[in-house]
Regions:
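Non-catalytic beta-sheet/beta-sandwich ligand-binding modules that flank or precede catalytic cores
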Residues: 1-136
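Short, solvent-exposed loop/turn and secondary-structure capping segments
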Residues: 66-68, 150, 165-170
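Active-site machinery of serine-nucleophile hydrolases
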Residues: 161-181
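Divalent metal-dependent phosphoesterase catalytic cores across multiple superfamilies
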Residues: 139-142, 155, 164-171
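Extracellular/periplasmic catalytic domains that process cell-envelope and extracellular macromolecules
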Residues: 47, 147-151, 172-176
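Short beta-strand element of the alpha/beta-hydrolase
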Residues: 150-161
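Short, solvent-exposed loop/turn elements at domain surfaces
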Residues: 14-17, 148, 163-167
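A short loop-to-beta-strand scaffold at the N-terminal edge of the catalytic core in hydrolase folds
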Residues: 131-147, 154
Length: 181
């Protein structure tokens, strides 16, 4: 998780200050590297007010001995031998400075919410063809045209442990195949 998007009940100005903001995801403290008003997908809104503020987060150091310390929204289930989404993914933000539209005073806001059912996964959206053959799920995408208006297909067979089930986003994110797009 490299971004969190907060929705406010009114628009705020681009004067978002995150210097004293504290963020935790799944109980892991995260460093805020950037903040800005955005649309509901986390894309920056230039020179305008918005109901959304995006905080960009640095990745925590990977710890293979404490997977819970990695702040990942999925885990490997030892009983089913599959990767699964966590049941809960708490996001806590404290002391973000914002200015409401029509105001000149900044105010500090804090929020805590379960974000597991509000996942945005733009890295897997390019895999827009999804289906099933028998009990095997698949996802595919159409590559950009190469030189001479030709494309060369790349076939990736997802066969890692845990990379099965009905949610194709899990295997796409589990093995970083989206990096090949």
């Amino acid at each position: 998780v490299t971004q969190v998007i907060f929705e406010f009940n009114q628009k705020v100005t681009p004067e978002v200050v995150h210097s004293s903001t504290q963020v935790t995801t799944a109980g892991v403290s995260r460093q805020v590297t950037n903040s800005y008003v955005s649309d509901d997908q986390g894309h920056v809104v230039y020179y305008d007010n918005s109901k959304y503020v995006t905080l960009e987060l640095s990745l925590p150091s990977y710890n293979r001995y404490n997977m819970g310390g990695n702040a990942e929204p999925m885990y490997f289930n030892l009983s089913t031998w599959t990767n699964q989404w966590l049941e809960s993914y708490m996001v806590s933000m404290k002391d973000l400075s914002v200015v409401a539209e029509g105001s000149s005073q900044s105010q500090m806001v804090s929020s805590e919410q379960d974000a597991i059912n509000n996942r945005l996964m733009p890295t897997t959206e390019v895999f827009d063809e999804r289906g099933q053959v028998g009990n095997m799920q698949y996802a595919a995408y159409s590559a950009q045209t190469g030189t001479g208006n030709s494309t060369k297909p790349l076939i990736v067979w997802l066969h890692g442990i845990g990379e099965r089930g009905t949610d194709m986003n899990i295997p796409l994110l589990s093995n970083d195949v989206y990096a090949l797009t």
